[in-house]
């Protein structure tokens, strides 16, 4: 069912269903759910009733991957789609969300994927498009662009593009750890998206890091890409059990196929210089 994006698709899937989730889910999902499921420091969610649970395949903030139980009510594939070799039937879910702009396609188009025989009540009624489940003239150009982006994403996966991105991410984390050994990398050691590094450097506010790196030409954030620009504590890190101070000092770095090793080296050089100056001021205070 084509929609204006994953946010609309989430509402179409979840409205009136009484679904539960953990507070690490994207707000497009959690705002429709009862957010009472527990989550550990590893980002894993305890899911005892999958048929009444919404769960993301990859967290939009940390990049941590979930172990999906069979029969899940809704799988949010938005962040993982295009970066991992995934397919709807592989998730075992009844419904799933995807979005075009997350794979380099046009903004303003997404889809709700539904297992055959699943009832979906239309929220937009009128002309009966999308088999009566989402009325309104389809964004044909956007949908075509979505298809082209999906084909390109498949080629990138086949060519090992994201494996190279993962190598760069690991080089970045190793270099940062050598420069500042106390840095915490959220989800490191577990299964994560290949492009995401979420770093905590206690005593160095996330929004300060963002501004300093921005002045050096690096686009980073203190939260998920959808929430960048909003200065507030990460509810994802809070739900995982990190302290308020740790959550306030988090920096999210997201890499792409266009990045090269010299980008990583320059990033680490700039980040480490700021971090060392901060440590020096503390020692002299």
Give, region by region, the residue ranges found by the protein language model.
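Pyridoxal 5′-phosphate
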Residues: 1-285
